[in-house]
Amino acid sequence: MSDRKMWSNLSGQKLNKEQTLWSFGRCKTLILEMFCGAMILTALAAAAGWPVSQPTDIEMDGIDLLVPTDRRAIEEQIERDDPFCLVMPFPCGPWNSLTYWNASRHPEFKIRNEALQKKHVPMLKWLCSIAKKRIARGRLVLMENGQTSRAWNLKCFEELEGLLDGLQSDASFEYGIGDQCLLGQHDRESGEPMRGRTKWGTNGEILKQNINPMWEQ
């Protein structure tokens, strides 16, 4: 998704930084990005003066969330920092439509991908367990993956639907579908918009509002 566009919308609320975070149970940071890539959200938050958690990505810090010890390290960081918003755009490789198309044509590829999925499932279950804890604590969670990702069919993701926010009784975790082009996604060479059909999950009403008008239940 376009991190820059989303953060621009969020930061437009003109919130008092020193008061807002602390009013939500004394969060130490605004955001922790997992699978952060270029860590654009973290950079924008820091540039705006917000305290941020150290983002994590295997290409940046070597933290591999497929490894139990690395997952424990990040879980300890989450407990220590208590970030207000946890962003989790988990890997789509083993679950996307193109992967399944290739698997339907090449039996050996299908075998390899099924093994990779089995390797990823414990990590995805862990992400969902973290999300449950954060939601119950009244913190924001934002998950993202392709609309057709088969990962969404896993029971752990289905169990998140409808979870009530721990601080706001009228808020709950919901999934929505929309196009990333409305958040600024485009082809790097041609500059033309790219649809990027995507599914998000969040308990944050402000996130849902800023993803609108494309939020589809």
PLM feature segments, named:
Residues 1-217:
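Conserved active-site and SAM-binding loop architecture
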